[in-house]
């Protein structure tokens, strides 16, 4: 199919067979898996997944691609295509033990990752191709430059595994940046205390609002220096020096 990639959907189509096989190996799909693909595009992953699965749900916003995907011989009786924007979908409607995969468009990857956290109880694992810089941010440890809001929120909910890099040559058209594959596995038993996710997101967003300022400055009016000291958290540190566990502690304190 000749399809001109649409800039507004951030479309870059995966074409490299070796990379496709490596992604499939990482996902390891089994016939009865409850699998959902976000943004199947021209079906580079969709088609080999359909060969291994009894059924696949896919969410695609582009009408041209919707028509193309439903006409594929391998799709017949197996592909459940949802014509929608993934940011508007209730993922829990597809049942428990959901395995989510996708080559996420760069322009919506961060909001979509945060959005998916709302449905974390319905998800077994997620495998995504993202801009390499985004995967580095997700996997970053505190005290590093890449560590930020995305690192804290995703690491609070999931075990993060940075799997491998994907060069621009694997796509058509070639993106200007490298990509990478990440595996996110929601915790069965969390290493962190349970806390209100909204409170955690709010405190993390405020803490990272101005990265060069100290935690005390960024959280002025929310928590005092003496209260931070009582929690054993150094208010003189910058937000990227505060661990996920410490942000959880802060959210818990504010919730009470």
From Swiss-Prot:
<protein>
    <recommendedName>
        <fullName>Ribosomal RNA small subunit methyltransferase A</fullName>
        <ecNumber>2.1.1.182</ecNumber>
    </recommendedName>
</protein>
<dbReference type="InterPro" id="IPR020598">
    <property type="entry name" value="rRNA_Ade_methylase_Trfase_N"/>
</dbReference>
<feature type="binding site">
    <location>
        <position position="60"/>
    </location>
    <ligand>
        <name>S-adenosyl-L-methionine</name>
    </ligand>
</feature>
<dbReference type="GO" id="GO:0003723">
    <property type="term" value="F:RNA binding"/>
</dbReference>
<feature type="binding site">
    <location>
        <position position="14"/>
    </location>
    <ligand>
        <name>S-adenosyl-L-methionine</name>
    </ligand>
</feature>
<dbReference type="InterPro" id="IPR001737">
    <property type="entry name" value="KsgA/Erm"/>
</dbReference>
<feature type="binding site">
    <location>
        <position position="85"/>
    </location>
    <ligand>
        <name>S-adenosyl-L-methionine</name>
    </ligand>
</feature>
<dbReference type="InterPro" id="IPR023165">
    <property type="entry name" value="rRNA_Ade_diMease-like_C"/>
</dbReference>
<feature type="binding site">
    <location>
        <position position="12"/>
    </location>
    <ligand>
        <name>S-adenosyl-L-methionine</name>
    </ligand>
</feature>
<dbReference type="InterPro" id="IPR011530">
    <property type="entry name" value="rRNA_adenine_dimethylase"/>
</dbReference>
<dbReference type="GO" id="GO:0052908">
    <property type="term" value="F:16S rRNA (adenine(1518)-N(6)/adenine(1519)-N(6))-dimethyltransferase activity"/>
</dbReference>
<dbReference type="Pfam" id="PF00398">
    <property type="entry name" value="RrnaAD"/>
</dbReference>
<dbReference type="InterPro" id="IPR020596">
    <property type="entry name" value="rRNA_Ade_Mease_Trfase_CS"/>
</dbReference>
<dbReference type="GO" id="GO:0005829">
    <property type="term" value="C:cytosol"/>
</dbReference>
<keyword id="KW-0694">RNA-binding</keyword>
<dbReference type="InterPro" id="IPR029063">
    <property type="entry name" value="SAM-dependent_MTases_sf"/>
</dbReference>
<keyword id="KW-0963">Cytoplasm</keyword>
<comment type="function">
    <text>Specifically dimethylates two adjacent adenosines (A1518 and A1519) in the loop of a conserved hairpin near the 3'-end of 16S rRNA in the 30S particle. May play a critical role in biogenesis of 30S subunits.</text>
</comment>
<feature type="binding site">
    <location>
        <position position="39"/>
    </location>
    <ligand>
        <name>S-adenosyl-L-methionine</name>
    </ligand>
</feature>
<keyword id="KW-0808">Transferase</keyword>
<keyword id="KW-0949">S-adenosyl-L-methionine</keyword>
<feature type="binding site">
    <location>
        <position position="103"/>
    </location>
    <ligand>
        <name>S-adenosyl-L-methionine</name>
    </ligand>
</feature>
<keyword id="KW-0489">Methyltransferase</keyword>
<comment type="similarity">
    <text>Belongs to the class I-like SAM-binding methyltransferase superfamily. rRNA adenine N(6)-methyltransferase family. RsmA subfamily.</text>
</comment>
<keyword id="KW-0698">rRNA processing</keyword>
